[in-house]
Amino acid sequence: MQVTVETKEGLERVLTITVPAANIEDAVSAELRNIAKNRRFDGFRKGKVPMKMVAKMYGQAVRNDVMGEVMQRHFIEAIVKEKINPAGAPTFTPVEFAEGKDLVFTASFEVYPEVALQGLDKVVVEKPQVEVKDEDVAEMLETLRKQQSTWADADIAAEDGTRATINFVGSIDGEEFEGGKAENFPLEMGQGRMIPGFEDGIKGKKAGEELTIDVNFPEEYHAENLKGKAAQFAIKVVKVESRELPELNDEFVAKFGAEGGVEGLKAEVRKNMERELAQAVKNKIKEQAINGLVEQNNIDVPSALIDQEVQVLRQQAVQRFGGNADTAPELPRELFEEQAKRRVVVGLLLGEVIKSEELKADDEKVKALINEMASAYEDPTEVVAYYEGNEQMMNNMRNVALEEQAVEAILAKAQVSEKAFGFNELMNQQPA
């Protein structure tokens, strides 16, 4: 076997492989003998059919099958010999293939990039310094009360915190437009659900009042035909309701299954908030470390890996919406391409951190991660036992632990400082 390697643009490589004719003919002859021996032919006893007849009937099909098998096998031998690491399946192209002649074919594919980590000392990370304060717990209890609240008719004007039930008809240039009409539409004031100016027109109005407002749809509005358009809405206020909050007492506490009355609920709420806060702090640190790693290391990415990741994201999107990945229409690639590329880049860079630091999943960290995750469930011991009895789940947690260890390795070389945050400030931040 002869092999030549051609480096194309970026990560693309082309192998030209020559396989001696004798190898091909031997493989074809062996397969034809196997057919003659095991297949029945009319007019002949099993195994007694003339080889010329078998070759005439099956020769071309066998030769094609042999060619595919030979190309695959010799490609693997070639990449082992040349110490090449393909990032995806190759595309085979026969160049010369005729009976009695050497087989010459090309294999085109991409390789993994060679990653030489740099700039870890330039990665900047601000470590959040934050705690759950009494006022944070009080605010969370108020949120729980609002979730359990009821609405009651009131002879009041609509304002933030009230709920106005309205009828409305929207028009543009005097013509009603699709989706611009509703009856008995409940609108909780102050939530910003409507386009700018809509709620402002309703504020101060009572049940039975009618009004007309002029507004503009934002340029970034989701409906293409309404972006930036000036519109007019005729509105009737059907009723205005005030929110009635339940008292913070034992009856309220019982709805959440907490023990120890109001103080017990406060303690449970604080515990949950502290657990969520710890995870948010960890995520914030990890996000900054990985962002810095990506910014400092610009690498080529094999398109084959991006293709694979796009497909994974497509399937996850379909499953999130309760669909079947086999029957759902294929979602556009552009919805996922940027995220897919980012995930591939992060995976390659973290893989290099793990390799260069010679990291292995720490058993104690794996246990700690499982216990931390299990603490959010009613019976943590049952969850821990489930993980420990499921090798696939354990492997998933080992990968999580290994990723955390890689982040720790980045932080050890990064510029890390501390920054004070409030609870809500940190919890409401969106990932960069």
UniProtKB/Swiss-Prot annotation:
PPIase FKBP-type domain location: 161-246
UniProt-listed Enzyme Commission number(s): 5.2.1.8
Catalysed reactions, semicolon-separated: [protein]-peptidylproline (omega=180) = [protein]-peptidylproline (omega=0)
Membrane-crossing segments per the record: none
Example GO BP: cell division
Gene Ontology CC: cytoplasm
UniProt keyword list: Cell cycle, Cell division, Chaperone, Cytoplasm, Isomerase, Rotamase
GO molecular function per UniProt: peptidyl-prolyl cis-trans isomerase activity; protein folding chaperone; ribosome binding
Top-level taxon: Bacteria
Described function: Involved in protein export. Acts as a chaperone by maintaining the newly synthesized protein in an open conformation. Functions as a peptidyl-prolyl cis-trans isomerase.
Similarity remark: Belongs to the FKBP-type PPIase family. Tig subfamily.
Free-text note regarding domains: Consists of 3 domains; the N-terminus binds the ribosome, the middle domain has PPIase activity, while the C-terminus has intrinsic chaperone activity on its own.
Protein name per Swiss-Prot or TrEMBL: Trigger factor
Organism: Aliivibrio fischeri (strain ATCC 700601 / ES114) (Vibrio fischeri)
Gene for this chain: tig
